[in-house]
């Protein structure tokens, strides 16, 4: 039911193209996943999201558990029907909330007790509970519960969190009983090569349908991000989809693809969109700036997204300056489409054996006959 098929390899790098087959369709890799934390990519309908070329989205177990609750989602027919998204969905386990809500939680080997950020009530999540929630949600891919420590933690503390993550993974594997849902394990270990290698080998030993690298892009220096991207792939199974969590910048995606990663997610395109910032090649345009007031060109003349086909920078500037919700939606749509387009261009370059680690498809010399 779940299969990862490698369709081409790059002779210049370790990049590859592939197809991840799921019960709700296939995901062509390399692929960027938009983030729909609460069962929605903020401000964007499922139909609009389809127009960007998105093939798989991410939702969050922790937040859906708090509201509206996994039982209600299950009663509706599952997460796909609930949000009217017929394509693959991956649910994050809530491990990131262990990190982001650190001041509101108490961690033990049994699980995490949170103070509900909505109403202050106590919520306990164990590995077993997290698996049950994701099975009830009915996502295509469920992530194992992990402990993501802050990047400032010392080596001993990160090793403790790593051992806890491994213990939780064993419990997740024992609990997960859904044949039409793939379970991915998560590698932790911070900036320490010894811990990353140990975690990669331990997680790979379970022979799960896919494997993820977590604890990246959580506030650390970009050099540390690149170090993990460069170091860890040699310890990962070749025949599994490799998911690098929390990465959404073009430079890091290009580097990660060159090292053999396949799937990425990040809130960046929609977060920037909600603040009026649009992607343009490898730049960011702040459409609030007065210089766009009389600019009647689209964000990107070469982009085929619904925003660029229909609206000017001047109109988007007007919407943003007046706090119109439509402006946030249109810019977010473009930003998602831009990242999907970028990974599509990478895929074409890999197939034509002209992909490089500093891939920049908007530069004619980089893409030969390819269009951008």
From Swiss-Prot:
GO molecular function, one term: metal ion binding
Residues involved in Zn(2+) binding: 303, 305, 308, 334
Enzyme class (EC, first level): transferase
Keywords, sorted A to Z: Glycosyltransferase, Metal-binding, Queuosine biosynthesis, Transferase, tRNA processing, Zinc
EC number(s) stated in the UniProt entry for this protein: 2.4.2.29
Pathway it works in: tRNA modification; tRNA-queuosine biosynthesis
GO CC aspect terms: cytosol
InterPro entries according to UniProt: ArchSynthase1/Queuine_TRR, TGT, TGT-like_sf, tRNA_ribo_trans-like
tRNA processing found in the keyword field: yes
GO biological process: queuosine biosynthetic process; tRNA wobble guanine modification; tRNA-guanine transglycosylation
Reaction equation(s) it catalyzes: 7-aminomethyl-7-carbaguanine + guanosine(34) in tRNA = 7-aminomethyl-7-carbaguanosine(34) in tRNA + guanine
Region (RNA binding): 246-252, 270-274
Record-annotated active site: 92, 265
Pfam families, sorted: TGT (PF01702)
Keyword tRNA processing attached: yes
Binding site for substrate: 92-96, 146, 188, 215
Protein family (similarity comment): Belongs to the queuine tRNA-ribosyltransferase family.
NCBIfam families per the UniProt record, alphabetical: Q_tRNA_tgt, tgt_general
PANTHER family per the UniProt record, alphabetical: QUEUINE TRNA-RIBOSYLTRANSFERASE
UniProt protein name: Queuine tRNA-ribosyltransferase
Species annotation: Prochlorococcus marinus (strain MIT 9312)
Originating gene: tgt
